[in-house]
Amino acid sequence: MEHSNPILMGNNSPQKFITIGEVMLRLTPPNYEKIRMASAFEASYGGSEANIALALANHGVDSTFFSVVPNNSLGKSAVRWLRCNDVHCTPMILSTKEETPSHRLGTYYLETGYGIRASKVIYDRKHSAITEYDFSQVDLDALLDGFDWLHLSGITPALAPNCRGLIIDMLKTAKKKGLTVSFDGNFRSTLWSWEEARDFCTECLPYV
């Protein structure tokens, strides 16, 4: 028999979590092969915030994930993967080609380490759907309605200016609505400079 494992608030009622970020297609050579030697790849999905949502759901926490994916087989498969792991995806946006012209799902290649050989990751996420979507269309107040906890990371704002604006607006809305906010800085030097990350995090601090 399965049991829920709610994270409790001060009044002992379970919290509802929402995370925002990019979910990506993960391609991995089987049997610890190196990418340069691979003739096939195993497909799965992942992403920092998506993994958090999945981990919470696997521990019985009411967990929701918000992102933008292209309205095609890859995007729908990513949503299906989340739902199969008990993550709520009601707010997810499946974008049209008009809304996100490149119509891409971000991809990364994972070369799994073996023994003393470290794992390696190659990202192919430029012009993904989440980086091209106009988030001014989203009613953030309605999106966060009914949630108690918002989790964000420093990866999403580093992806593109529209994502940066989304995270700031999301933080302001969460503050206004009284949500608890957790923020994982998670600096990625391949996405933006240390100075850009510092300035952004400084702007975020009043809302965390």
Question: What is each model feature region?
Answer:
Residues 10-13, 142-148, 173-178:
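Glycine-rich phosphate/diphosphate-binding loops that line cofactor/substrate pockets in enzymes
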Residues 1-2, 147:
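Non-catalytic pre-domain segments flanking phosphatase-related domains
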